[in-house]
């Protein structure tokens, strides 16, 4: 079968000429595929006398096996050469210093919340949380802000329907705590709150921490001492602090708390007051027996003052150049 010998010689030459696995696979298909040259030799057996077919078929199968072995050997060599090339090209000098691991850090708002929680935790306050989708009872009614109360107009509220809203303050957590626990109560409620406002000093979502103490014989003096110590600890300096008379529906008397800035001007930092008797009535506590104080602070506001940030929106823009300053 001289034609068969020529095919084998051509196949071996094509195998040796293949420079990569893809080219080698094309050679395999050309000679051993369904329509390959050697495969088609099997169909030519029908032209031989019956007595010659077994011997001729055995020769063709032997040749196909030899070509397949040559393909396997060439493929193994090509893969080995490729691996050696990659190892040489991609080798690592282990004596070089490794890549420095990029250290992350807490977001400045989270750092402030953690600092507040640590201070009040050392005073025996527990940390409570509540739903951000609130009902009007816990957000308004229980806090001495009934329907049509003018104070409701001060809250640019995101309403879902007539009864459900995105909470405008974390005071609802305090209401739930007073319903579920008996005095003495010491609790702070950090969390996200929502109001429809957006400018350099306001965002639609921001963070608050509100605090509450309910017990016997709680006085405004207790409130002043607690907040003065907190502000001194938070800003890490002996600040000049003043309490200005103010109005909140849920406290009486009420006050705004200011600190003296480095520029000689007063800066408002939080609001506070003695818990209003109506609020105590609403949660089933007798104001003749129990009293308490409450306070609330904007976390972003305190963070801006502590770190000298002038634009509140920078906290929410995820600019790494800004955030890396707080590591």
Curated annotation (Swiss-Prot):
Protein name from the UniProt record: Phenylalanine--tRNA ligase alpha subunit
Which Pfam family is one of those matched by this entry?
tRNA-synt_2d
**Subunit architecture:** Tetramer of two alpha and two beta subunits.
EC class name: ligase
Q: List where in the cell it is found.
A: Cytoplasm
Give the UniProt keywords, A-Z: Aminoacyl-tRNA synthetase, ATP-binding, Cytoplasm, Ligase, Magnesium, Metal-binding, Nucleotide-binding, Protein biosynthesis
The organism's place on the tree of life at top rank: Bacteria
Q: Which residues bind Mg(2+)?
A: 252
Question: What species does this protein belong to?
Answer: Photorhabdus laumondii subsp. laumondii (strain DSM 15139 / CIP 105565 / TT01)
Cofactor binding, per record = Binds 2 magnesium ions per tetramer.
